[in-house]
């Protein structure tokens, strides 16, 4: 079997995990085994799509790679952030010289914000039950 040249990156955001493979091509997109015209067909929201493909835009590599993405967990917003980090990390495997550009736009930083856990005695993480003086 012929070995396919590709670049791999893992991205995480909130509870979403994305495994991204970049393969030299003309910009085809495959998410969770299903072919899409563009990422916009998967994310539906143009803001999430723009956020996800930003690493390709700032490095002028948009249309040079086919994207094969496996993403699970979280919602579409978290998945968008996970895909973004995965693409950025895969681009580093492709060319280490892209690091300063990606670093400048903070695309190699994993967003550490997670949902705060709910505490007992409270309605949510911080929301206390209503208090009545009388």
UniProtKB/Swiss-Prot annotation:
GO BP terms: translation
Q: What keywords tag this UniProt record?
A: Ribonucleoprotein, Ribosomal protein
Kindly indicate whether the keyword Ribonucleoprotein belongs to this entry. yes
Where do Basic residues bias regions lie? 120-134
InterPro entries, sorted:
Ribosomal_Su5_D2-typ_SF, Ribosomal_uS9, Ribosomal_uS9_bac/plastid, Ribosomal_uS9_CS, Ribsml_uS5_D2-typ_fold_subgr
One of its Pfam families is: Ribosomal_S9
Q: Which cellular components does GO assign to this protein?
A: cytosolic small ribosomal subunit
Instruction: Specify where the region named Disordered lies, as residue ranges.
Output: 114-134
Q: Name one GO molecular function term.
A: structural constituent of ribosome
DNA damage as UniProt keyword: no
Record's family?
A: Belongs to the universal ribosomal protein uS9 family.
What's the protein name? Answer: Small ribosomal subunit protein uS9
Organism of origin: Thermotoga sp. (strain RQ2)
Q: Gene name on record? A: rpsI
């Amino acid at each position: 079997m012929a070995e396919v040249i590709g670049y791999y990156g893992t991205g995480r955001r909130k509870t979403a995990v994305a495994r991204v493979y970049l393969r030299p091509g003309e910009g085809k997109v495959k998410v969770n085994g299903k072919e899409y015209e563009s990422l916009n067909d998967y994310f539906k929201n143009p803001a999430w799509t723009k956020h996800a493909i930003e690493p390709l835009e700032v490095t002028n590599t948009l249309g040079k790679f086919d994207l094969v993405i496996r993403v699970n967990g979280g919602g579409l917003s978290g998945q968008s952030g996970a895909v973004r980090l995965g693409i950025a990390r895969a681009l580093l495997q492709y060319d280490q010289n892209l690091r300063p550009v990606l670093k400048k736009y903070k695309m190699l930083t994993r967003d550490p914000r997670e949902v705060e856990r709910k505490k007992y005695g409270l309605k949510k993480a911080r929301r206390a039950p209503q208090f009545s003086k009388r």
